[in-house]
């Protein structure tokens, strides 16, 4: 009987790195691969990965951007320690290949793999290249990207997303073009987005009889946001539902006629997978990462972009006034056409091919 192939997954820090990596890991588990994860104890992967039945090992590493002089002076020693820790784990686990999907942990892990002559596959989730992946790409066996032109010559494979996002009904089945009420989902991410929480009650006040809103406000914000809605409108259970978190975000996207949200790479690709239009409010960052992610759908007419410095209730209300169900269905179909349903499979195939060659 042939020996099971082994993959070491290196991803951490945020859901945008961790969830696509979990999708690939689970796909390969079904192909009888053995999976181990390299992460850090203080980030989300420490709790999330074991819940998905994947063993995890830890190294000590954190980000260096924006840190003080003392931290930067210590950086070479911190990185060297992390590389040695990763090398020890690799020597023990003996993977056939490692997959780097971003986050601080990928850097030391990728260097350690190269030192051990283990093939490295890199996947970049964002439209703007991350620092870790820009360095890892120089030593990688294969480089993959979610969006075109992040790397000059890498294969475009999309972002792996969970099967649940492709299992909802198609846009043509979901959109009721005779209903005047717009179902609006507002998502600020797990921490909420304060500016969206503040502005949406004002938007509803301008369109009191047109909107049905589900608003995910983030941890600890329900009471404050409920009060804001009460100040602006005669709040009813039918018009607004306010919640800290949404357990089944795929079904929530499928329920909505339009989503108002940030534009992290995973969010953009999940909305494309479901086929739901969006108003993106990109998080302001010097490299415009979220803005460029959002353009993937906005450039084909599947979404609108409102930059944060231009954001006000009147602008959002005007966008919602100007769309009818026929227009939203057209946008939804354009979003669906930009989805990459074979992304998880393709990343897994590249990993398997790397071992064969």
UniProtKB/Swiss-Prot annotation:
**Entry keyword set:** Cell cycle, Cell division, Cell inner membrane, Cell membrane, Cell shape, Cell wall biogenesis/degradation, Glycosyltransferase, Membrane, Peptidoglycan synthesis, Transferase
Gene3D superfamilies documented for this protein:
Glycogen Phosphorylase B
Enzyme Commission identifier(s): 2.4.1.227
Name the pathway it acts in: Cell wall biogenesis; peptidoglycan biosynthesis
Membrane topology qualifier: Peripheral membrane protein
InterPro entries attached to this UniProt entry: GlcNAc_MurG, Glyco_trans_28_C, GlycoTrans_28_N
Q: Could you tell me what reaction this enzyme catalyses?
A: di-trans,octa-cis-undecaprenyl diphospho-N-acetyl-alpha-D-muramoyl-L-alanyl-D-glutamyl-meso-2,6-diaminopimeloyl-D-alanyl-D-alanine + UDP-N-acetyl-alpha-D-glucosamine = di-trans,octa-cis-undecaprenyl diphospho-[N-acetyl-alpha-D-glucosaminyl-(1->4)]-N-acetyl-alpha-D-muramoyl-L-alanyl-D-glutamyl-meso-2,6-diaminopimeloyl-D-alanyl-D-alanine + UDP + H(+)
Signal peptide from the UniProt entry: none
Q: Name one GO molecular function term.
A: undecaprenyldiphospho-muramoylpentapeptide beta-N-acetylglucosaminyltransferase activity
Taking the first listed entry, what is the main subcellular location of this protein, grouped into a coarse class? Answer: membrane
Indicate whether Iron appears among the record's keywords.
no
Q: Which cysteines are joined by disulfide bonds?
A: none
For the biological process aspect of GO, one term held by this record is:
cell wall organization
Q: Work out whether the entry's keyword set contains Transmembrane.
A: no
Give the record's family classification: Belongs to the glycosyltransferase 28 family. MurG subfamily.
The name of this protein is UDP-N-acetylglucosamine--N-acetylmuramyl-(pentapeptide) pyrophosphoryl-undecaprenol N-acetylglucosamine transferase
Annotated organism of origin:
Histophilus somni (strain 129Pt)
What gene, per UniProt, encodes this protein? Answer: murG
């Amino acid at each position: 009987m042939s020996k099971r192939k082994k993959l070491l997954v290196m991803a951490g820090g945020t859901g945008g790195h961790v969830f696509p990596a979990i999708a690939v890991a689970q796909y390969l588990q079904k192909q009888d691969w053995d999976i181990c994860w390299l992460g850090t104890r203080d980030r989300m992967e420490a709790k999330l990965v074991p819940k998905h039945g994947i063993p995890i090992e830890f190294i000590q590493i954190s980000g260096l951007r924006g840190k003080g002089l003392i931290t930067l002076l210590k950086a070479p020693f911190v990185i060297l320690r992390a590389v040695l820790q990763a090398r020890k784990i690799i020597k023990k686990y003996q993977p056939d290949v490692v997959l780097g999907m971003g986050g601080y942990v990928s850097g030391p892990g990728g260097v350690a793999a190269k030192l051990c002559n283990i093939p490295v596959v890199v996947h970049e989730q964002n439209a703007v290249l991350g620092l870790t992946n820009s360095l890892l790409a120089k030593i990688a066996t294969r480089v993959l990207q979610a969006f075109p032109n992040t790397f000059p010559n890498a294969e475009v494979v999309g972002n792996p997303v969970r099967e649940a996002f492709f299992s909802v009904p198609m846009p043509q089945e979901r959109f009721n073009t005779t209903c005047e009420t717009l179902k609006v989902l507002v998502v600020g991410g797990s921490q909420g987005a304060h500016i969206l929480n503040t502005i949406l009650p004002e938007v509803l006040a301008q369109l009191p009889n047109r909107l049905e809103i589900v608003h995910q406000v983030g941890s600890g914000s329900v009471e404050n946001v409920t009060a804001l809605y009460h100040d602006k409108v005669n709040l009813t259970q039918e018009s607004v539902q306010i919640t800290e978190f949404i357990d089944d975000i795929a079904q929530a996207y499928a329920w909505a006629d339009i989503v108002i949200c940030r534009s992290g790479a995973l969010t953009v690709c999940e909305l494309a997978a479901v086929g739901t239009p969006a108003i993106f409010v990109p998080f302001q960052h010097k490299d415009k990462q979220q803005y460029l992610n959002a353009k993937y759908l906005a450039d084909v007419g599947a979404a609108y972009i409102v930059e944060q410095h231009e954001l006000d209730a009147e602008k959002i209300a005007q966008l919602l006034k100007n769309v009818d169900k026929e227009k939203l269905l057209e946008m939804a179909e354009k979003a669906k056409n930009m989805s990459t349903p074979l992304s998880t499979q393709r990343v897994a195939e590249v990993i398997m091919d790397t071992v064969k060659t």
